[in-house]
């Protein structure tokens, strides 16, 4: 049986890893993977890859993987406008016009300065490195070793995942909220910094990508999934499991606290 608790296993059992993540966090949608490709031909060679027949936002493409279980590959021409392309570095989208934020002035930001500052604040993959991108359910393993793994979850589940990450080798997480174009906070940041990246999905993700109102998005290099799951197993042994049972707002708290922290 393949070891899914450490990244040192000879071959990752992506199906087992995905199933464990889904079960531990009670996920309502499919954990999925994202991978960048220097050549579109390599993306097109993925088994059972789907290619869009219409123009989409990347939020929609991501939704096809996380809600429908599809494996989808895109190039710059499949994505609407420069904003979607810029975050993942496709199509040389980061022109002076894009940096100005002109298309967002009066829509999301009051003036030129605010629109330009927003563009500058985004985490984006540099242009010129990649021709294509693919997303696929993590369990399928079709992307081989993906660049990042992603999943949607409730705030409570996200907090438990973070607790798992912080169980061993604690560090504080400081995440960004760029506002609209929040994909820059999730997959844009994870692809560029190679660190776990949590986001509050924006209007476009919810309107076009099918993201539910109570969902947040985690994007992370896959090795951090192993660390978080190991941490959550340790927390479970201490009695902390998701979903967290309600104790009651009028109860004497001492009995509950004593279970975790002992009696004074």
Tell me what each language-model feature is.
Residues 10-264:
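Acidic, serine/proline-rich low-complexity intrinsically disordered regions
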Residues 3-6:
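Domain-level signal for soluble alpha/beta catalytic cores
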């Amino acid at each position: 049986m393949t070891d899914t608790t450490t990244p040192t296993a000879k071959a990752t059992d992506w199906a087992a890893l995905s199933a464990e993540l889904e079960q531990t966090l009670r996920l309502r949608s499919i954990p999925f993977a994202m991978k960048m490709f220097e050549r579109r031909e390599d993306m097109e060679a993925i088994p059972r890859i789907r290619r869009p027949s219409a123009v989409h936002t990347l939020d929609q493409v991501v939704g096809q993987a996380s809600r429908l279980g599809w494996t989808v590959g895109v190039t710059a021409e499949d994505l609407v406008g420069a904003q979607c392309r810029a975050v993942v570095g496709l199509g040389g989208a980061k022109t002076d016009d894009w940096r100005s934020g002109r298309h967002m002035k009066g829509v999301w930001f009051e003036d030129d300065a605010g629109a330009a500052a927003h563009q500058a604040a985004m985490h984006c993959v540099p242009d010129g490195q990649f021709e294509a991108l693919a997303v696929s359910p993590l369990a399928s393993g079709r992307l081989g070793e993906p660049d990042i793994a992603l999943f949607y979850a409730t705030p409570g589940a996200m907090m438990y995942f973070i607790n798992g990450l912080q169980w061993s080798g604690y560090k504080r997480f400081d995440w960004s909220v760029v506002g609209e174009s929040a994909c820059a906070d999730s997959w844009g940041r994870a692809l560029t910094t190679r660190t776990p990246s949590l986001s509050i999905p924006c209007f476009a993700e919810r309107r076009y990508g099918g993201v539910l109102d109570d969902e947040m998005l985690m994007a992370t290099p896959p090795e951090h999934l192993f660390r978080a799951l190991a941490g959550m197993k340790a927390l479970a042994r201490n009695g902390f499991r998701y979903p967290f049972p309600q104790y009651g707002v009028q109860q004497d708290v001492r009995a509950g606290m004593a279970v975790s922290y002992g009696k004074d």
